[in-house]
Amino acid sequence: CGTLMGGLSKILTECEHDVSGSDLNFYEPMSSQLEALKIDLVKGYERLPDADLYVIGNALSRGNPCVEKILEENLDYISGPEMLGKIIKSKKVIAVSGTHGKTTVSAMTASILQSKYGDVGYLIGGVLGDGSWSARLGSNEYFIVEADEYDSAFFDKRSKFIHYFPNILAINNIEFCLLYTSPSPRDTIRS
């Protein structure tokens, strides 16, 4: 389970949703975090858990048994970034983007705002140095999100950060290096 889907699972449990998930494998640090939340983790894609809405991560594509069942049965689904965007739409969103350092800058921003304003929300793509969760909804108006340029899902090729509508955008740095997301320097700048 990736850091976006794992963090989103944590936030959804805070919103009092029942959450379960399927993946081929569950790795640290996400596996421990999800197990602590008592989320039903299904190893493999043979069994699609019952749900009102399926949140599909960008690691899944057509041909995946769960994806195919969702499409064949016309079940409701959404991408992880779009789901997060809906949850945080009423917050003051601070998005941290750039080629390198997003996790570090996001964590530092969350820590600074936490000390100033209290219970801020965040979703960060890494483990925090103090051992706290990689995500939480927070009770105040601020939400910090690590906003990367990877596509949202097989059915939504837009960058994840398109869904976050930040009030503040921190662009850490831009480097032409990810040819699979931006085939030219112009595409890198445009995204």
Give residue spans per PLM region:
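N-terminal leader/targeting and accessory segments in enzymes
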Residues: 1-83
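Phosphate-binding loop of NTP-binding sites
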Residues: 11-14, 49, 58, 62-183, ...
